[in-house]
């Protein structure tokens, strides 16, 4: 009997076995974790802070609520949510990568944020939380690294409370051709050089550029969220569509 063909997925522009991608992505983030915040500021000229602020403003989070910051990395969103939910609320900073989770924990504790934030190493495709548990879920620059995005979106839908909302902040497709060309030149020629200088790892930032190009565009991701069960899915193009914030509700 012939062997079954192996399922594949993308890792940047490469095609790899589905069961290998998770480990390959993990290697990338183990490599860059220590300089992740510095690189974010350098790569985006600090604009990532504005994108994240807009995400916070669209969250509708209130005191006493429960928030999941998925692929939360070094905790930029979790820190702000911690103040918003107050002592009676809860923020769960979850990341599949233990190096990133460690950096987030250390960063928030150094800032005195300790009372209402929990840290969980979790795979977005199989979230270890009860049904209807969170009032709000955010995933910031993480969905494109997930192997099975549809499965992850369904998992997020399951753990979100009725009336809750999901916010997906992610790189997307620039709206104008000249901007797209300039962005490509920057991504494929400048980013790897910055990665080499700061992290000594140009390949991880070459993967970053490639993973952005392979990520679903605005309308495709909107359709995926709808297929996962989310209602009233909309998106906001930021910085000319270089980044988009998708928002969907569970009713």
Curated annotation (Swiss-Prot):
Q: Which UniProt keywords apply?
A: Menaquinone biosynthesis, Methyltransferase, S-adenosyl-L-methionine, Transferase, Ubiquinone biosynthesis
Q: What is its EC number?
A: 2.1.1.163, 2.1.1.201
Q: What GO biological process term is on the record, naming one?
A: methylation
Which reactions does this protein catalyse? a 2-demethylmenaquinol + S-adenosyl-L-methionine = a menaquinol + S-adenosyl-L-homocysteine + H(+); a 2-methoxy-6-(all-trans-polyprenyl)benzene-1,4-diol + S-adenosyl-L-methionine = a 5-methoxy-2-methyl-3-(all-trans-polyprenyl)benzene-1,4-diol + S-adenosyl-L-homocysteine + H(+)
| Pfam family membership, one | Ubie_methyltran
What pathway does this protein act in? Quinol/quinone metabolism; menaquinone biosynthesis; menaquinol from 1,4-dihydroxy-2-naphthoate: step 2/2; Cofactor biosynthesis; ubiquinone biosynthesis
Query: Which GO molecular function entries does the Swiss-Prot or TrEMBL record give?
Result: 2-methoxy-6-polyprenyl-1,4-benzoquinol methyltransferase activity; demethylmenaquinone methyltransferase activity
Q: Which InterPro entries match?
A: SAM-dependent_MTases_sf (IPR029063), UbiE/COQ5_MeTrFase (IPR004033), UbiE/COQ5_MeTrFase_CS (IPR023576)
Sequence positions that bind S-adenosyl-L-methionine:
74, 95, 123-124, 140
Membership in a protein family: Belongs to the class I-like SAM-binding methyltransferase superfamily. MenG/UbiE family.
Tell me the function of this protein. Methyltransferase required for the conversion of demethylmenaquinol (DMKH2) to menaquinol (MKH2) and the conversion of 2-polyprenyl-6-methoxy-1,4-benzoquinol (DDMQH2) to 2-polyprenyl-3-methyl-6-methoxy-1,4-benzoquinol (DMQH2).
Q: What is this protein called?
A: Ubiquinone/menaquinone biosynthesis C-methyltransferase UbiE
Task: Please report the organism this UniProt entry assigns to the protein.
Answer: Serratia proteamaculans (strain 568)
């Amino acid at each position: 009997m012939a062997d079954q063909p192996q399922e594949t997925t993308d890792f940047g522009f490469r095609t790899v076995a589905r069961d290998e991608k998770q480990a390959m992505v993990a290697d990338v983030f183990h490599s860059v974790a220590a300089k992740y915040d510095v690189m974010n500021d350098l790569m985006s000229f600090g604009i990532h802070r504005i994108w994240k602020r807009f995400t916070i403003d669209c969250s509708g989070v209130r005191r006493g609520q429960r928030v999941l910051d998925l692929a939360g990395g070094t905790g930029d969103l979790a820190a702000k949510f911690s103040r918003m939910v107050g002592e009676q609320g809860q923020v769960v900073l979850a990341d599949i990568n233990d190096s990133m989770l460690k950096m987030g924990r250390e960063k928030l504790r150094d800032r005195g944020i300790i009372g209402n934030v929990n840290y969980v190493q979790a795979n977005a495709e199989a979230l270890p939380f009860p049904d209807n548990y969170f009032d709000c879920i955010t995933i910031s620059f993480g969905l494109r690294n997930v192997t099975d995005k549809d499965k992850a979106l369904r998992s997020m839908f399951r753990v979100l409370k009725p009336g809750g909302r999901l916010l997906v902040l992610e790189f997307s497709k620039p709206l104008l051709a000249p901007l797209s060309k300039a962005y490509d030149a920057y991504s494929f020629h400048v980013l790897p050089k910055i990665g080499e200088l700061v992290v000594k790892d140009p390949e991880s930032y070459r993967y970053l550029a490639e993973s952005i190009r392979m990520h679903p565009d605005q309308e495709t991701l909107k359709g995926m969220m709808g297929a996962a069960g989310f209602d009233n899915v909309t998106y906001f193009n930021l910085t000319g569509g270089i980044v988009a914030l998708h928002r969907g509700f569970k009713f």
